[in-house]
Amino acid sequence: MSTANPPLPPVIEFRNVGKIWNPGTRREFKALDNINFCIDDLPGRGEMIAILGPSGCGKSTMLNLLAGFQEVFPPTSGEILVRGQPVTGPGLDRGMVFQKYSSFPHLTVYENVRFGLDLNRDKLGLEEPEIDRRCREWLKKVGLDAHLEKYPHQLSGGQQQRVAIARTLVVKPRIILMDEPFSALDEPTRLEMQRLLVELWAEVEATVLLVTHSIIEGVFLGDRVWLFSRAPGRIVKEFRDLPAPAPGVHPLQVQRTPAFLEAVERVSAVFRKIEAGEPVD
């Protein structure tokens, strides 16, 4: 008699998902068209999928639908499932890091990071000692353990994004949604944040969907890269077998290799076709 465990449902599944803004009016705009994909629940680790596409093609709309945010949800058509269950709104299993700095200005770094734990302590079954331990642990991991009592206006842009990442990961979400989190940073800080993300992702075993406008960043961070069409957005190309970053290795050590540069050119060639409105194989 077989004792094999039944297969896990996909960690994320989109079934024919579409989104139309202002339907039935002169301002009607079709943002997403027939989005279909499954992301498997891999044992011991999650995938990081980088999402690129022209401006206004619905990348952020797709993330916001998956997050269940009220401003976007529900989709106009189709269904979104997380681990086999329909998404009906926000949940602790999904965390999000935005492009704009999203810390509460009146709270310290420490208070910002513990905000979600305090808000959901009953759901998470956490007592004060564990909340404090988790917060201090994650602030140390993102290199802010010496800045606990500072306020957001006292931090650099990179430090503010470290706060946002710690606040997201401290809740231990199964899915992390990142909407151009490093685009406002200068190049050295951006590279350092890429390195930090690789190290933290190796620890948390979460599935990450990362929207970025940088092909280099997408190829460096992604297990897979998805390219979106012009609006209405849909996935028109997927790239796999990309050079894999390793914890502790500076991004430039990978990004200057021939294999990495070749992968960037492959993605760039298709991206140029999309922007020109040419068909994609």
What spans do the regions from the language model cover?
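Short coil-to-helix segment of the ABC ATPase nucleotide-binding domain corresponding to the Q-loop/switch region
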Residues: 107-116
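Helix-to-loop junction immediately C-terminal to a conserved catalytic motif
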Residues: 67-70
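A short, proline-enriched helix->beta-strand linker immediately N-terminal to the Walker B motif
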Residues: 170-174
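Hydrophobic anchor residue at the start of the ABC signature
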Residues: 165
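Conserved ABC ATPase "signature" region
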Residues: 85, 118, 126-147, 199
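Catalytic Walker B motif of ABC-type/P-loop ATPase nucleotide-binding domains
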Residues: 176-179
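Conserved ABC transporter NBD signature motif
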Residues: 75-89
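Conserved ABC ATPase signature
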Residues: 151-155, 159
